[in-house]
């Protein structure tokens, strides 16, 4: 069981490391802690935190840095959101208050505003997409091993694409696979459909298809088209500012995620639900890929009968969480107000 002072030391290590990017030593802590404590006592507290796995020692310095476990503990128990500055609040209100002719424009601009305010990569998901549910899926044979895949959603949207089916897969097998999809996935939000395509659905399809990959590709591509209409990313090049040359593989993974597959991006946002309006997930907690040196802050917003949407920030693990959580909480409220005002013109 950690003492209050040890938790204070952890909190201060995270603050100082966030600000400087440098390992934090006992002498620095002795100067920065709000209570007077000897250097020896601080070293003992740091040893206890290290034994608990909350901080770790770097090879190049005698200082300590937070571990992933330390950040998780901090986010779950210690973080205190900072009130957004008057300047940032005025910027949010002014930018969202511009004249927009389409809801898509508001959602797209929200990602750009958020990325400009934070210098991180911002992702914005419109309310209707986050609330769209699958209502049906079918394949229509066109001959010459071609089929038209048709996906229908509860907002009346119909997506269709033509695909070539491998000769090894018969249409009878495809019909059985379609029945599984409709039995298991109809009625679910598209976010959950994308998740289940990567978890339990493939094993179900194995009962009828020798290799379900071809069918999953067809369904996944149509799903991606249906789920990506109001999905916007702002500041994608900001990733290059906080990922160094040694993280080039990480950068390629993220760019591929953002540019190539909105189904994956939807799954990235759809993590485990916590009972807080703003949630933070660290690299190892992110799916479908582990983004080791990054964190994702997500916040949902409610537009009444028009559904719920989501905004998110993707940035370095050592981002200033207190500030970012406070900013995102205010931003989601202001975005919800702006979209509510927009819809009011059509609800009268």
Curated annotation (Swiss-Prot):
UniProt-listed Pfam families: HrcA (PF01628), HTH_DeoR (PF08220)
A GO BP entry: negative regulation of DNA-templated transcription
InterPro entries: DeoR_HTH, GAF-like_dom_sf, HrcA, HrcA_C, WH-like_DNA-bd_sf, WH_DNA-bd_sf, WHTH_transcript_rep_HrcA_IDD
Keyword Transcription regulation: yes
GO molecular function, one term: DNA-binding transcription factor activity
Top-level division of the source organism's lineage: Bacteria
Protein keywords: Repressor, Stress response, Transcription, Transcription regulation
Transmembrane segments: none
Similarity annotation: Belongs to the HrcA family.
Task of the protein: Negative regulator of class I heat shock genes (grpE-dnaK-dnaJ and groELS operons). Prevents heat-shock induction of these operons.
Name of this chain's protein: Heat-inducible transcription repressor HrcA
Originating organism: Lacticaseibacillus paracasei (strain ATCC 334 / BCRC 17002 / CCUG 31169 / CIP 107868 / KCTC 3260 / NRRL B-441) (Lactobacillus paracasei)
């Amino acid at each position: 069981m950690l003492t209050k002072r040890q938790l204070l030391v952890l909190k201060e290590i995270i603050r100082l490391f966030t600000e400087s990017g440098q390992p934090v030593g006992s002498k620095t802590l002795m100067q920065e802690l709000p209570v007077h404590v000897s250097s020896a006592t601080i070293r003992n507290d740091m040893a206890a935190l290290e034994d608990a796995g909350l901080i770790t020692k770097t090879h190049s310095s005698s200082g300590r840095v937070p571990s992933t476990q330390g950040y998780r503990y901090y986010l779950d128990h210690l973080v205190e959101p900072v009130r957004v500055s008057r300047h940032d609040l005025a910027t949010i209100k002014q930018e969202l208050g511009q004249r927009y002719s389409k809801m898509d424009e508001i959602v797209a601009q929200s990602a750009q505003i958020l990325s400009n305010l934070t210098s991180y990569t911002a992702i914005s998901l419109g309310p209707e997409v986050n609330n769209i549910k699958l209502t049906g899926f079918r394949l229509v044979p066109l001959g010459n091993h071609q089929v038209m895949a048709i996906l229908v959603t509860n907002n009346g949207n119909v997506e269709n694409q033509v695909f070539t089916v491998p000769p090894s897969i018969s249409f009878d097998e495809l019909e059985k696979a379609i029945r599984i999809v409709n039995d298991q996935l109809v009625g679910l939000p598209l976010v959950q459909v994308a998740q289940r395509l990567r978890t339990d659905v493939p094993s179900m399809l194995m009962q009828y298809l020798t290799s379900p990959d071809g069918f999953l590709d067809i369904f996944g591509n149509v799903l991606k088209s249906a789920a990506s209409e109001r999905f916007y990313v702002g500041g994608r090049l900001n990733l290059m500012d906080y990922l160094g040359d040694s993280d080039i593989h990480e950068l390629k993974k993220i760019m591929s995620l953002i540019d190539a597959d909105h189904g994956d991006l939807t799954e990235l946002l759809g993590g485990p639900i916590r009972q807080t309006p703003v949630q933070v997930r660290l690299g190892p907690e992110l799916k479908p890929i582990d983004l080791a040196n990054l964190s994702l802050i997500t916040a949902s917003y409610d537009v009444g009968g028009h559904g719920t949407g989501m905004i998110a920030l993707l940035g370095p693990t050592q981002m200033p969480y207190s500030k970012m959580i406070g900013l995102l909480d205010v931003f989601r409220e202001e975005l919800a107000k702006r979209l509510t005002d927009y819809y009011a013109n059509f609800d009268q």
